[in-house]
Amino acid sequence: MLTPPVGRGDHAFGPPDARVTLVEYGDFECPFCGRAYPELKRVLKELGPKVRFVFRHFPLVEEHPHAQHAAEVAEAAAAQGKFWEMHDLLYQRQQALEDDDLLKYAGELGLDVRRVQRELTAHTHAARVERDVLSGAQSGVSGTPRFFINGRSHKEPGDARTLAAALKRSL
């Protein structure tokens, strides 16, 4: 089960009263998350307002040295109202996640780059990322991507067809 349940502090896309809530624990540097990303976008587009999508950070820092800073820069973007734009950009450019790349992306999105740089250097958003990691650990997450549908772990393969079928069964 998902612990804690989806709340106001989560990054959510879609109507709050959707019949289905899909939560992903993801890592911006994880190749499996990168492969799942376009499929997930396709499924969410297909199902439209029937599904609310929530993203929670789960950077696998032992395996992915840039994942923590990527998560923190996504939070810095969120602080300027551009979480989802940064989320998408990080997955689209997953092979380039050095700090200089992250700051370049912030500029491309029209963010205050100096502010992002200060926040990244000071780890201003590290506690927010850690909160997601702890909730993932409490929910039994050990790898990424990991999905939960209406609070229940989705353990089937994460390909678009399987995920879409599971979401449709939950409608």
Q: Model-found features: residue ranges?
A:
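Extracellular/periplasmic catalytic domains that process cell-envelope and extracellular macromolecules
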Residues: 15, 46, 140-141
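A short beta-strand-turn-helix
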Residues: 3-20
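A structure-centric signal for secondary-structure junctions around beta-strands
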Residues: 17-19, 70, 143-144
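C-terminal cap of thioredoxin/glutaredoxin-like
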Residues: 24-26, 32-42, 103-171
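Structural alpha/beta surface segment adjacent to cysteine/selenocysteine redox centers
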Residues: 23-24, 28-108, 112, 168-171
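Alpha-helix initiation/capping motif
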Residues: 15, 62-66, 95, 118, ...
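N-terminal targeting signals for export/organelle localization
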Residues: 1-4, 169
